[in-house]
């Protein structure tokens, strides 16, 4: 049985660890609220762009943008969104497992893959497996910078427009609620005909022949022309989806970290209680032994 001093040292060590995890839990909770606000703030923008683009495409059915054209899949691009830091439960493990399964599937089908990584964890994974890494961006901080994101993703978008790849996928973690985050592997390009938002469940469909949910329907005059506006809107829509993927992942990261640190703090509290019980028993045994020795010595005299 360990001595009293050793047990006291262990208790002190676990108490110090609990202070750290408790502080990290509080920081993650604060960052989580801000990350959720940023995530939700981007949704109205994407919805309005989607509505306008759908209205334009319905009015100009003869126009076909490259982002909407289905091709035979011979090569694809994959954008893997992970965190820069750990201590967030199984968040990175789950999305990595899904991504590796898809990469294996592409390999079995003879489809070439070129990858882009956001976050240190994803970069490390793709480097270890020897993936064809064409761009990456790390140390994104707590607030995603759209310019930095677009700088890394431009390689993939240019490859799609030039025909080097026939589809673009994004692997990220969708934020469901504070306690639940789910890994998703979604096709970004070519866009679905209805311009559905892949990061919103139950998103309304704005496809050819579908209803645009609105209280009015006006025939707008677009400058310089409708096709130019469609080109610009679709580009912005794709950029918005990528930003949303990173924002969702950041909200998921802080939620997962808060939950993980709370679990660590609760476990530390339990360990402290168990050690305190062992300490009390050991101390009681030592006192009892000392009293017995004193009584035995007195009896001998």
From Swiss-Prot:
Biological processes annotated in GO: proton motive force-driven plasma membrane ATP synthesis
Supply one GO molecular-function term: proton-transporting ATP synthase activity, rotational mechanism
Q: How does it sit in the membrane?
A: Peripheral membrane protein
Keyword Transport among UniProt keywords = yes
Record-linked Pfam families:
ATP-synt
The record's note on quaternary structure and interaction partners says:
F-type ATPases have 2 components, CF(1) - the catalytic core - and CF(0) - the membrane proton channel. CF(1) has five subunits: alpha(3), beta(3), gamma(1), delta(1), epsilon(1). CF(0) has three main subunits: a, b and c.
List localization entries: Cell inner membrane
Q: Which InterPro entries match?
A: ATP_synth_F1_ATPase_gsu, ATP_synth_F1_gsu, ATP_synth_F1_gsu_CS
Say what the protein does: Produces ATP from ADP in the presence of a proton gradient across the membrane. The gamma chain is believed to be important in regulating ATPase activity and the flow of protons through the CF(0) complex.
Family to which the UniProt record says this protein belongs: Belongs to the ATPase gamma chain family.
Query: Which UniProt key words apply to this protein?
Result: ATP synthesis, Cell inner membrane, Cell membrane, CF(1), Hydrogen ion transport, Ion transport, Membrane, Transport
Record-level GO cellular component terms: plasma membrane; proton-transporting ATP synthase complex
What name does this protein carry? ATP synthase gamma chain
């Amino acid at each position: 049985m360990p001595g009293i001093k050793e047990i006291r040292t262990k208790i002190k060590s676990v108490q110090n660890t609990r202070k750290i995890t408790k502080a990290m839990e509080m920081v993650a909770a604060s960052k989580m609220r801000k990350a959720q606000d940023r995530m939700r703030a981007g949704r109205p923008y994407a919805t309005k762009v989607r509505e306008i683009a759908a209205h334009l495409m319905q009015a100009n059915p003869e126009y076909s943008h490259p982002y909407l054209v289905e091709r035979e899949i011979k090569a694809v691009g994959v954008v893997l969104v992970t965190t820069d830091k750990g201590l967030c439960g199984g968040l990175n493990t789950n999305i990595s497992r899904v991504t590796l399964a898809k990469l294996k599937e592409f390999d079995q089908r003879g489809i070439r893959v070129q990858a882009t990584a956001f976050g240190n964890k994803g970069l490390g994974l793709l480097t270890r497996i020897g993936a064809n890494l064409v761009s990456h961006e790390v140390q994104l901080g707590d607030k995603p910078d759209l310019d930095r994101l677009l700088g890394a993703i431009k390689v993939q978008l240019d490859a799609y427009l030039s025909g080097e790849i026939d589809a673009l996928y994004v692997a990220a973690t969708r934020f469901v609620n504070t306690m639940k985050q789910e890994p998703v592997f979604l096709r970004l390009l070519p866009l679905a005909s209805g311009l559905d938002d892949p990061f919103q469940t139950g998103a309304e469909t704005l496809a050819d022949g579908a209803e645009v949910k609105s209280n009015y329907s006006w025939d707008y005059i677009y400058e310089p022309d409708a096709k130019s506006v469609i080109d610009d809107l679709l580009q912005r829509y794709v950029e918005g989806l990528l930003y949303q993927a990173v924002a969702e992942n950041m909200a998921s990261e802080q939620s997962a970290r808060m939950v993980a640190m709370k679990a660590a703090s609760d476990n530390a509290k339990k360990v402290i209680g168990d050690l305190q019980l062992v300490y009390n028993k050991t101390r009681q045994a030592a006192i009892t032994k000392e009293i017995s020795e004193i009584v035995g010595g007195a009896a001998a005299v």
